Amino acid sequence: MVVEEKRLVSHEIHLKQRPVGMPTESNFELVKVNVSDLKDGEFLVRNIWMSVDPYMRGRMKENKSYIPSFQLGKPLEGGCVGQIIKSKNNQFRVGEYVLGNFGWREYWISNYSNDVMKIDPNMAPIQWYLGILGMTGLTAYVGLLKIGELKGDDGDNNNNTIFVSAASGAVGSVACQIAKIKGFRVVGSVGSQEKVKWLLDQAGIDYAFNYKEVGENNVSSELRKACPNGIDIYFDNVGGKHLEAAIDNMKVFGRIVLCGMISQYNLSSLPAGPSNLFLAVTNRLNLQGFIVRDHYNMLNEFYADMSKWISEGKIKWNETVFEGLENAPKAFLALFKGENTGKMLVKIGSDALV
């Protein structure tokens, strides 16, 4: 008698409705699906960690962007780390760990593409490949060194000031510490006194303030106090009032790195732009946006530098973790409420599955 192998079932988070304004848990749906049988050249991955990132909010909208919108009734996507549990591909063996873009689900099948990369679990905790050793770290690195034209080790950096908004977040916290490694004076804005303390005591920056306590309309005056000689580079993760305040305080020929604008992602209608943009003309400012995937040619340089800084203890890395795939929507919503310090992650499965 032939005994049929029991079909593997995977849980996935689907986009049920497109959010208007701030997302709610009702926009998401936990779904059970059958996992297909493997074809030649394919391998099956069980996810262990998944990343939750602000850019995902943009993909929930139905508009043209640099990356396709999420589809209704389909699983969401995002960075993930998992372990191969079945394989019909000689290059990808059972037990190996891989980095992919198929988060928001328990299992996924790949036939290998440029979006899948093997990772070494002995080099660092596997979830770091979603953060400090992944796109998060690379975003901070590219933003400062390439877009912000940050020059290091020239002996004059103590006279130079960098301002980072959302400074205790995943990208912001790395940007702060890279700037300190390069010898710059660093000022950071965050949304709680606990985060102020982390930036000063752990990340080692020079000045941090709670914009909620100061008041968004008073960020400019707070920056005048924190940066009496002006700002050389502003690493913008927030947009809105923070961007306007930074423009007020930039030095002549200052650089503004437009990385993200989390203050605007959930607005149903966009506010007017900065009222002081003419200062970009008179002060000859450079404002440049960027998308990290345009700069993958810097990966080897990034890995070399970041690995060295981590081994030397120069980078402090923090994570906020939600347990269980079913809590991924809660983690996503918490991100926009400022409830994370460092990288927001969801732990889906145990570290060793095979």
Where are these predicted regions, by residue range?
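Glycine-rich NAD(P) Rossmann-fold beta1-alpha1 loop
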Residues: 137-138, 166-176, 239
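C-terminal capping/lid region of NAD(P)-dependent oxidoreductase domains
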Residues: 2-10, 314-321, 329-354
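A generic alpha-to-beta junction signature in SAM-dependent methyltransferases
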Residues: 150, 227, 250-251
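Adenosine-nucleotide cofactor-binding segment
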Residues: 180-245, 293
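Glycine-rich beta-strand-centered segment in the early N-terminal region that forms part
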Residues: 34-52, 60-104
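Glycine-rich phosphate-binding loop and adjacent beta-alpha segment
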Residues: 238-315, 348-354
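NAD(P)H dinucleotide-binding glycine-rich loop of Rossmann-like/cofactor-binding domains
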Residues: 71, 76-83, 91-166
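Short, glycine/polar-rich helix-capping loops at beta-to-alpha or helix-loop-helix junctions
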Residues: 106, 191-201, 270-277
